[in-house]
Amino acid sequence: RLQRKAENGLRGIVLDLRNNPGGVLDAAVAVSDAFLDRGRVVSASGRTDESQLEFDAQPGDVLEGAPIVVLVDEGSASASEIVAGALQDHQRAVIMGRRTFGKGSVQTIVPIGRQAAIKITTARYYTPSGSSIQASGIEPDILLAPVKVELTDSSQDTVRESQLEGHLTNDAAGETT
């Protein structure tokens, strides 16, 4: 769908990774790869041969070079840092916001018997430039000051759906419009 929009004159995108705690490595690689034409996406290095991993982008940037802005903050961690780091190192996106969390470790689930397992750290992630994300995070290209959001008293100026003309009712509860 994004590729269709790019073909129809998409001028750029904003990828909002703020407060994104991460997820699956394969998904982070796939998202990064979608916007990169070539090069390293991420690597991992640990004590064993099995923990030495390298992921490279395949040819084909779905945006065909259209600008990307990635928003990050201290809640951006793990897989979201992989995406931000890859796009930053390849100068494919401008990273804006605040320094990310710094969760650059690889966890592996090791079975213990039939019904139990433990999760242990087995490696560290590295951006394409070779920087470790662990405990340092991704430093934005453009640092933004935190925005203070003040919530108003919920009893003030509150409009409930039931106050709106033509609102839907719960027929099972015997309400009528």
Region locations from a protein language model:
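C-terminal "post-core" interaction segments
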Residues: 1-177
